[in-house]
Amino acid sequence: QTLAYRKEVYEKEKKSVSKTDCNNYCNRQLKKEYEWLKEVDKFALTNAIYNMDAAYQKFFKEHAGYPKFKSKHDNHKSYTTNFTNGNITVDFGCNRVKLPKLKGIKAKLHRNFIGQIKSATISQVPSGKYYVSILVETEHVELPHINQNTGIDLGIKELCITSAGKKYENPKIIRKYEKKLVKLQRQLAHKEKRSQNYYKTKKKIALCHEKITNTRKDYLHKMSHEIISENQVIVSEDLQIKNMVKNHRLAKSISDVSWYELTRQLEYKAKWNGRKYVKIDTFYASSQLC
């Protein structure tokens, strides 16, 4: 609604609308039209407007795509709320999380943390599960400096080979679940749309995809942590993945190994821990060295 308002004002008056104006429009106008908005956490609405504004600014400054209207049928639903006056609490003893406008919720807490809570993002994935991501301000201790550098060669047969000869196997996660997914997709095709059995099968497919994603991320996190911990400087090839997946024979295998996710993890973990991660040109003979 605020995106439509912003667009309408610009088309009629040729005037730019700020995120503060959009927030005021939401409080003064939209809450009158849609009574249920008064029941929603105010920070969730403000953050949604600020996210829309960030996407709008990105469209002009970084030539990104124009912000899209979100459908209520979107599989990925989420909102962010801010911490103030103890409105977000985590009880590790009772495994409960308290959020604004909600009572204490029982949760599976993955690990304890110490620090000041800044915000919480609540999301629902296609399988129907809910997740809460807590942003905490805490002191970070960098890894100790070491005199060890490495070059890594990314591949399909072996996911990664270091210049020291260390090999990380390709777990081929999609291949392991491929038969199960094909079977479930066939079952779904024979179900009556919008029936109870249709949604049950759809949920099974979503859970299978979720398992693939979580297994892959877990493997990549352990692998990237090991590479960062053992080396001060890490060098890899700057692969043009978008061009490579155009080869239909290799597309599935390339998507399964998730080179982009691995290099993304190496990049931010290197910054966190005082390491250096370097990407070299595609045409540099890195494979011969590794």
For every predicted segment, state its role:
Residues 113-116, 126-290:
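Positively charged, helix-rich recognition surfaces that bind polyanionic ligands
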Residues 1-7, 48-56, 181:
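Short, Φ-rich (hydrophobic/aromatic) sequence segments
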Residues 21-125:
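Acidic carboxylate diad motif detector
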Residues 16, 20, 24, 43-46, ...:
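An alpha-helix initiation/capping motif
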Residues 8, 35, 39-42, 50, ...:
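Short capping/connector residues at structural and topological boundaries
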